[in-house]
């Protein structure tokens, strides 16, 4: 019998799936790319919510979700590298440089984000069991 997925994790996964679905409908490549990246980021946040352990730290600099995910879920390292790289383009888009991505770039990221979300959704059941032990 599996443990239920914590509400915060289920909520993040639901938000990831919803954001991804909205990105699918975008006409502009930059907005499609941005939405796909945010959807993947929300899926990553759900893994962090399951695996992260609060730590007392001093003056640590902020760490990207992708760096944290790479540390806490090394089995996702290829994904973290891919989405960490796409974060730079998303930041450029949010700064107004909408021409930094093509339609193909946006479609590729959208496909990757959908695949990543599905992987994380499958992992969530296994991770909730791990967290309970």
Regions found by a protein language model. Give the residues of each.
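Terminal alpha-helical segments
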Residues: 1-133
């Amino acid at each position: 019998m599996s443990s239920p997925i914590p509400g915060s994790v289920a909520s993040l996964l639901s938000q990831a799936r919803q954001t991804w679905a909205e990105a699918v409908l975008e006409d502009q490549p930059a907005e499609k790319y941005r939405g796909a990246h945010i959807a993947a980021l929300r899926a990553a946040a759900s893994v962090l919510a399951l695996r992260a352990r609060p730590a007392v730290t001093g003056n640590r600099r902020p760490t990207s979700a992708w760096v944290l995910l790479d540390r806490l879920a090394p089995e996702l390292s290829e994904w973290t590298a891919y989405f960490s790289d796409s974060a730079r383009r998303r930041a450029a888009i949010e700064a107004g440089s909408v021409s930094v991505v093509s339609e193909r770039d946006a479609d590729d990221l959208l496909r990757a984000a959908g695949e990543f979300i599905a992987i994380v959704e499958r992992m969530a059941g296994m991770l909730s069991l791990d967290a309970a032990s």
